């Protein structure tokens, strides 16, 4: 797999490796097949991810398993109200001799080897910290100590504290748009999986659980090259292009599209969002999904499979409806699918 070969053989090798990667990750987390598939899509689409879910559903375990399967370095930081932007880059302390010392922070500690960076409870950090993180996400580089550091293989994952609202700073819409996906994680609903998580001691030791994942299933240093090859290999027929544009139009202008939701003024519902960048992200993710399914062309199901996670957080509602966002946006997306005919 690590020796790149031209054409379909190379992508077939990597698709087989991606399937093995998913199987390895599933050893560490139970009942999260959809989240694993979406994370795999994000990895090969070279996009950053916001994880949504309650405390204790396995977000950290999942990301540690992903980092091990990818190879490269894993770093995690906890968002706090007193965090400064520089805390991501370096930290200072007094040495035993009383002199100040400066050491690299979590972003620089492993530099080019950093493949997974997890920002836990990102909304506890202040906007200044968000700004630096977003720059690192966009440019995969940062300037410090009179030089520029590059992170060509970096993938940023973050999650938000959805329960406690004191001393939190919600990311503005423009910041959330930088994330390719927002992926929800819930406790498994399957009774067997629930019993295993509670009663099987194997799932109580996350360190050992993570070690069961085969290391370096994917060569993280080559994913950028493969990601580009995937985008060029997967074609979209004119009918699919028209379908994507139709979904986009109906999402941002649901009233004129004939969509109706009970008790909602559809002409006032959507304030903005769903930019061309967001729709380009949608197609990028859909192409990866098609590749994982063994096709070199897009079908409507590729678009629909990633649409909620890629587009939902990019829709900005009127303030009067924002408090009901968790209910309204899924209903809106379902109505969009029902209204826009698939080719």
Swiss-Prot record:
Keyword Cytoplasm: yes
Pfam families given in the database record: AAA_3, AAA_lid_2
GO cellular component assignments: cytoplasm
SMART domains recorded: AAA (SM00382)
Family annotation (InterPro entries): AAA+_ATPase (IPR003593), ATPase_AAA-3 (IPR011703), CbbQ/NirQ/NorQ/GpvN (IPR050764), ChlI/MoxR_AAA_lid (IPR041628), ClpA/B (IPR001270), P-loop_NTPase (IPR027417)
Keyword set, alphabetical order: ATP-binding, Cytoplasm, Methanol utilization, Nucleotide-binding
Binding site residues for ATP: 53-60
Example of a GO MF term: ATP hydrolysis activity
Subcellular location: Cytoplasm
GO BP term (any one): methanol metabolic process
Similarity comment: Belongs to the MoxR family.
PANTHER family for the chain: MOXR FAMILY PROTEIN (PTHR42759), REGULATORY PROTEIN-RELATED (PTHR42759:SF6)
Job description of the protein: May be involved in the regulation of formation of active methanol dehydrogenase.
Full protein name: Protein MoxR
Annotated source species: Methylorubrum extorquens (strain ATCC 14718 / DSM 1338 / JCM 2805 / NCIMB 9133 / AM1)
